[in-house]
């Protein structure tokens, strides 16, 4: 288990530990068709932090807009982390996903000492790919038939990465 992540403050949002009071909202967000398409049906335990990372609520003025998580390899020979995020449909199109990813990227590079971050959206999830590219992630390959979600068919995912030396120090922390 990694140390608890502190509250991470962005310009319009904060990333904080999920509380039991957040679970109903996050379950409802995950059940929305626009989110379920990429994440599948919510299951028990989905809102527990991973053993080798953390799961954080995306809090906008006290409202839970979604969640963002990271899983890390802490072996000093590797020091990298993977990131995932979902936002409720009502929050789409406002730049909040980009800001949340940028805030977490800053933390993972500056505080956790990672040298490489990855994210792997479905190749058909063009808004997510644009969001991650705006933060600085670049495509490096396609993970063929990588995952199955709501429709149970295999889908390709785009592997994107961001290296610490390529990161522009929070260029996308806000709108």
What kind of region is each of these model predictions?
Residues 1-48, 165-175:
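A short, well-structured alpha-helix characteristic of acyl/acetyltransferase catalytic modules
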Residues 110-120:
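Conserved GNAT acetyl-CoA-binding A-motif
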Residues 98, 123-141:
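Conserved active-site alpha-helix within GNAT-family acetyltransferase domains
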Residues 37-92, 107, 163-167, 174-175:
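Acetyl-CoA-dependent GNAT
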